[in-house]
């Protein structure tokens, strides 16, 4: 894949750092910005226009599902991959209903995040079963 610009959204700074490390280990991938909640994610997505957004599902204030819906309304060409600590089938449904192109359980992040981002950038869904 060519150069990919990624917006990372999570309310925990340590998690954002880990995601940045994992994503930027891929050749040509760059985390172009970070956000700590859904409202900030919507603002940054409009300002930065990343190739893909990796977003936590559960955050204070505007959560990842609400932010994804808003991003899909304003910039539907930017795919979103949801990450979640809560690995239940209902979370997959919520992610799909919000317009996300992928959903990865945090326990599988190191194994599944890169394939999920690659799929999303190609505008292909990536919804493996959650535990």
At which residue positions do the language-model features occur?
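Active-site beta3 strand of CheY-like receiver
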Residues: 48-54
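Short hydrophobic/Thr-rich beta-strand motif most characteristic of the beta2 strand and flanking loop
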Residues: 28-36, 44
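Acidic catalytic/metal-coordinating carboxylates
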Residues: 37-40, 63-66
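C-terminal output helix
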Residues: 90, 108-121, 125, 129-130
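Conserved acidic segment of CheY-like receiver
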Residues: 2-15, 19-23
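The feature encodes the CheY-like receiver
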Residues: 60-61, 88
């Amino acid at each position: 894949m060519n150069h990919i610009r990624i917006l990372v959204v999570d309310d925990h700074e340590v998690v954002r750092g880990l995601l940045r490390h994992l994503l930027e280990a891929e050749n040509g991938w760059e985390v172009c910005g970070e956000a700590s909640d859904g409202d900030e994610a919507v603002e940054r997505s409009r300002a930065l226009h990343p190739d893909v957004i990796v977003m936590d599902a559960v955050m204070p204030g505007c959560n990842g599902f609400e932010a994804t819906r808003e991003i899909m309304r304003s910039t539907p060409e930017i795919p979103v991959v949801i990450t979640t600590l809560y690995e239940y089938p209902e979370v997959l449904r919520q992610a799909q209903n919000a317009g996300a192109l992928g959903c990865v359980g945090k326990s599988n992040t190191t194994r599944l995040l890169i394939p999920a981002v690659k799929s999303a950038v190609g505008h292909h869904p990536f919804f493996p079963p959650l535990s």
